[in-house]
Amino acid sequence: MVKRNGVFLGTKAGAMVAWLALSMPTVSLAVPPTVTGSLDNRYSDNVTQSAVDEVSDTESRINLSIDHQTDPGRCMASTNAQVGYGTWWDEAYDPELYADAAFFGDCEIRQGLNWELMDSLNQVLQNSRGTDTPDNRTLKNILRTGPRYTMFLGQRDQLSLSAQYQNTEFREPEETDSQRYIGSAAWNHIFDPTLSGGISVSMDRAELDTGGEIDTDVASLNWQKNWAVTQLSASIGYSKLTSRFGSFEQSSDGLVGQVALMRDVTGSLRFFLNASRELTDQTSDFDVRFGEFTFNLRQTSEVEVTALDVGADKSFSSGETLRLVFFANRADYLRVSQKEDSVGIDTVYTRPLGPLWNFDASVRYEYANYDEASENDNTLSVDTRATYSLTRDLSLSGRVGHNRRESDRLANEYEESWVSLGVSYQFR
């Protein structure tokens, strides 16, 4: 029987969120939040995703989700959160807490001066080379807050200053937590109604609970361009990262940049591209901004990261939708000069089967290379679901899926088939 010990996130971040939320002016709650509860039972013939000694078990999970956005006003806030608690019938694992939540709040203190509060809580893997099972997962909470001041220098120029505090905590005590202080300044010039650009500088000072420190400085050129059906924003710059652990000190530098492109090809087809290259550490929010990217928490903290997402969204007159995403990621762990690369494709298809029935399916393939051990992994996941609406608020669902991994290392291979039945209710 597989067991794991862990404690939930510390109270520092939660206490600060509560204090700041109470300190902000009241936000408008004219539109009530959407709250949904569900109960799912999932049977798997290989819950540990093992190459040998496969274990079958059924997990019962209670889920609660909330989605809310306030009306525009002096203070605005948006919340999207899903929380679940699962237990295993044959105790293959200890009871598990699941979470995927994001909160953003912005209050105008006075003209030009705003206070921002952001918090994200996500399930992440501890070892990127491991399997997506409870004994290889942890919760990562990132709280960021601070003031932002914007000043207009004439009709075409704008100066923005910000100072932020960020706290990152993991559920497992063996993972590295951090506190960081981020200061930034940016100047932007409007060249014409469709083109603007400028320069920005930022200083990031991270203090790790292991006693280490990581300083990251960035200077960039930024620009934004809009066409009739296309929006482009990009930056290119120079970054220097310095890490200190006791008497050890190491510096790395290089070119960094970001690109975000969106184009409405037709009224029913949209193309998008997002790419970024940064010098950062594992307690940053890079894996939140690029969901296909995974930090390896078993490696050293300092890392040069590169991520690319290219895809398209297509809708059909019959109500069908198709989303296709190609992704490529690289993590270069600087202190040990080890690289992890991954490329893959993720496809999601949805189709209404009638006034009460809906069907969706997803297929994900990923190829991963680990240069340290000269190993390659190929992972394929298939997930299909049918949903039946009993009433406007009550629905039933059934899912069938299959996961498979082939690897140069036989111990990393596995094959899993699973089936799930669930019921959900939307409270009003």
Model-derived segments and their meaning:
Residues 29-428:
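Gram-negative and organellar
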